[in-house]
Amino acid sequence: MFEKDKWMTIGEIVAPQGLRGDLRIKPSSDFPERFTKPGKRWIQKTDELPTEIKLTKGKLIPGKSIYVLSIEGVSTRSSAEEIIGWKLVIPIDSRPMLSKDEYHYHDLIGLEARRGPSKALIGYVTDLIKGGNDLLEIELVEGKKVLVPFVKEIVPEIEIKEKWLLINPPPGLLEL
């Protein structure tokens, strides 16, 4: 039986590339080998069971955050177009171990966001936006979404097992 929490999305198929069935992938993983090293992977249509595939080759497009992958059995542009929007997934237990202050994207989404010494609930983490400085998107309890720099000075404590993180925002940050 399919269990959603046993799989982790590492990318999304966003477009075909060329006429031979190659696929453009928008990654949501910081591990390039997931897109470049040949081997077993899975693709998944929303709310369906993942389907095992074989990645035959992959490369990063220079200057862009897009990978081009070749998958066994997808050899025409039309067959590539059929799976646009599908996710590239891996079993969650195949995640690499991280050092003390590193976190998997999947583990941060859904965490309670708490504030200050009282650790009062202020909202929930809804996204992590990658960039020069990563940003946590937090939906506040009143429904407004705010972006918080994901740095130790502002997010000093993260308790993955207890499903919360602490935010000490500078004055005015949550009012923007």
Curated annotation (Swiss-Prot):
Gene Ontology cellular-component annotations: cytoplasm; ribosome
Location, primary (coarse class): cytoplasm
Subcellular location field: Cytoplasm
UniProt KW Metal-binding keyword: no
Keywords of this entry: Chaperone, Cytoplasm, Ribosome biogenesis, rRNA processing
Domain PRC barrel: 100-173
Gene Ontology biological process terms, A to Z: ribosomal small subunit biogenesis; rRNA processing
Disulphide bridges: none
Chaperone as UniProt keyword: yes
UniProt-listed InterPro entries: PRC_barrel-like_sf, PRC_RimM, RimM, RimM_N, RimM_N_sf, Transl_B-barrel_sf
GO molecular function: ribosome binding
Purpose: An accessory protein needed during the final step in the assembly of 30S ribosomal subunit, possibly for assembly of the head region. Essential for efficient processing of 16S rRNA. May be needed both before and after RbfA during the maturation of 16S rRNA. It has affinity for free ribosomal 30S subunits but not for 70S ribosomes.
Domain characteristics, as noted in the entry: The PRC barrel domain binds ribosomal protein uS19.
Binding partners and assembly: Binds ribosomal protein uS19.
Family affiliation: Belongs to the RimM family.
Name used for this protein in its record: Ribosome maturation factor RimM
Organism of provenance: Prochlorococcus marinus (strain NATL2A)
Lineage: Bacteria, Bacillati, Cyanobacteriota, Cyanophyceae, Synechococcales
